[in-house]
Regions:
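A short, solvent-exposed, low-complexity linear motif enriched for acidic/polar residues
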Residues: 4-236
Length: 236
């Protein structure tokens, strides 16, 4: 008797079907009906990020079943699994569009059962001449306005980030599961005085980026530093 499609697609033993997504979270403005997400005093209209070399770390189900705690377990990588191969590729993720948070799929596929505790990845700089013109030569771009002034915050660095699970026990994968990498705008802009951002070249756009563009080096350094603690992993 021929196998059904469901049988063909069922995960192999010890594996589950998992979808890894990405999104952004922040405060919602309350001053208008069509409110945007806000990062401090910055009203955000769009947020894009490039990723590559992403890998998911987990404590195996075998160790959990043996009574080994998450803290004492050996962290393994899923790079060789179907999901690991998919999410490790270069990605361009749209996290906020027209002021609204988006949920973007990074990848989906089979991955070993266990408790997933963190996701490591590197920001990916879009190449010169890439299709996304606004993201050209950038690895992260946030656009919006501060008190009516058009504002951009961007990075070119291909730096490694670590999204740690919000739960100290990680998230169990044992059956179909959705996990999300979350960029926290409040944490990213904590202690950053965007009211002080300058448009030093008077081109009509306030830019906070590398090489002291527009004279905002201090703000850029703070955001870049905050970013390392502003990304985390959650389940849905």
């Amino acid at each position: 008797m021929a196998c059904s499609n469901d049988d063909d697609e069922a995960p192999k033993e010890g594996y589950s079907q998992v979808t890894l997504k990405a999104t952004a979270e922040g405060e919602s403005e309350t001053s208008s009906e069509n409110s945007r997400l806000a990062a401090g005093v910055m009203s955000v209209s769009s947020f894009s990020v490039g990723t590559q070399d992403m890998e998911m770390k987990y404590v195996s189900q075998a160790e959990i079943d043996a009574g080994i705690s998450i803290g004492d377990g050996l962290l393994e990588t899923n790079l060789s699994a179907e999901l690991g191969t998919e999410v490790s590729q270069e990605k361009s993720l749209q996290l906020i569009v027209d002021g609204e948070s988006q949920v973007t799929v990074i990848g989906e596929g089979q991955t070993p059962n266990g408790h997933y505790t963190e996701v490591l990845f590197t920001l990916h700089q879009h190449a010169e001449g890439s299709a996304g013109s606004e993201m050209e030569n950038k690895s992260l771009l946030i656009e919006g306005d501060v008190e009516g002034k058009s504002t951009q915050v961007w990075l070119a660095a291909e730096k490694q980030l670590r999204a740690v699970a919000a739960s100290s026990q990680g998230y169990e994968v044992k059956g179909d599961t959705d996990l999300s990498v979350v960029f926290d705008l409040e944490a990213m802009f904590e202690g950053v005085d965007m009211d002080a951002a300058l448009d030093a070249n008077s081109d009509g756009v306030v830019e906070v980026g590398p090489d002291n563009i527009d004279g905002n080096a201090a703000l850029y350094s703070q955001i870049e530093s905050n970013l390392e603690g502003a990304v985390w992993l959650k389940n849905q």
